[in-house]
């Protein structure tokens, strides 16, 4: 497999940009929860939101004039990934570039507004301005139009693992000689409705922080943002292997799939970027790591950045790539002291490979391995 990361873009609750966000993670910074409320109920929740000003330099494209938050996040991350790639590998022909967009919950804010009008005033009140933003592929459509991509553009809908499955699809696309590049973008927006749903599923906690790898899961905090990687045949970081994993219908099956993925991707020189988020995922990942790679250094970005669902796996890939590039990993925040895992120290890491484990909350598990 000759698949490399040529450029990356990052829009997070800690800011925008690969180096600025990475520097904050290395310093031990973490996002601050903001209160989310809604007129339909008195209950409030906490979520990690994108800071004001993070999107201030987006181009004044007509497509973004009325675009939803998720579309704007995706556009910012995608454009940043392209800009970084151009600075490292040179000019990029967008006519030979495909686009794969990964999403989980989609444009919830505009969808809620659209159906609220319908329920309140009848079908005749349905807004033709809001409807285009309610479909899952709206961000991909906007980004393709901004970049001038007239060919292959796909949207994958899944859970927290969908970003890795999007990279697998991009790898398949790049086997076609018609493409030299594939831009993979994952994005999510936070809303009260999502918080309420995850709360009802007993996956959400009322206040930060996210506490990973504790013996009794304590819940997660939702976040929003986007991550993007431009895949090409040139670049510093190489994707050695992608494991599309599998689906689980029962939580007790998660550990079995994670162990198989780790077994297939195992490398004694690899660190692990986990998807631990304060839910059942943590214990499943811990058990698999203890069995397959017990000495590996383990880091998870979600205590600092939150659970961004559709964007989360791309964020993990960016963290893994940065760890290989800088030879450092941030501190593992709020982790259980008796977790039985090896967490990063302030010293440089000697890892030359990085394994990304991504376990979603709705039945999907996947993984990949990077090297430099």
Where are these regions (language model features)?
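Short beta->alpha junction loops
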Residues: 155-160
């Amino acid at each position: 497999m000759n698949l490399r990361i040529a450029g990356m873009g990052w829009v997070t609750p800690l800011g925008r940009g690969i180096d600025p966000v990475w520097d904050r993670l290395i310093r031990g910074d973490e996002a601050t929860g903001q209160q989310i409320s809604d007129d339909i109920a008195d209950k409030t929740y906490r979520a990690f939101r994108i800071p004001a000003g993070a999107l201030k330099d987006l181009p004044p494209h007509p497509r973004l004039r009325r675009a939803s938050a998720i579309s704007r996040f995706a556009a910012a991350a995608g454009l940043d990934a392209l800009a970084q790639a151009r600075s490292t590998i040179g000019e990029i022909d967008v006519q030979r570039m495909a686009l794969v967009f990964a999403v989980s919950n989609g444009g919830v804010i505009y969808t809620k507004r659209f159906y609220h009008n319908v329920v309140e005033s009848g079908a005749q009140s349905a807004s033709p301005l809001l409807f285009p933003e309610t479909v899952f592929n709206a961000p991909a459509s906007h980004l393709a139009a901004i970049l001038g991509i007239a060919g292959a553009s796909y949207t994958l809908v899944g859970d927290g693992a969908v970003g890795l499955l999007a990279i697998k699809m991009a790898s398949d696309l790049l086997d076609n000689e018609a493409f030299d590049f594939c831009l993979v973008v994952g994005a999510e927006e936070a809303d009260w409705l999502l918080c309420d749903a995850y709360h009802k599923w007993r996956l959400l906690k009322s206040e930060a922080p996210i506490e990973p790898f504790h013996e009794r899961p304590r819940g997660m905090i939702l976040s929003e943002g986007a991550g993007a990687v431009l895949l090409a045949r040139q670049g510093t970081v190489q994707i050695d292997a992608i494991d599309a994993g599998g689906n689980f219908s029962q939580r007790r099956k998660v550990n079995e799939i994670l162990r198989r993925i780790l077994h297939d991707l195992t490398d004694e020189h690899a660190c692990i970027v986990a998807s631990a988020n304060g839910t059942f995922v943590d214990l499943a990942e811990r058990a698999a790591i203890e069995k397959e790679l017990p000495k590996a250094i383990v880091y998870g970005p979600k205590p600092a950045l939150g659970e961004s669902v559709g964007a989360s796996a791309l964020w993990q890939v960016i963290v893994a790539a940065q760890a290989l590039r800088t030879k450092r990993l941030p501190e593992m925040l709020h982790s259980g002291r008796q977790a039985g895992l090896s967490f990063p120290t302030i010293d440089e890491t000697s890892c030359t490979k990085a394994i990304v484990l991504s376990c979603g909350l709705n039945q999907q598990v996947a993984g990949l391995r990077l090297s430099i």
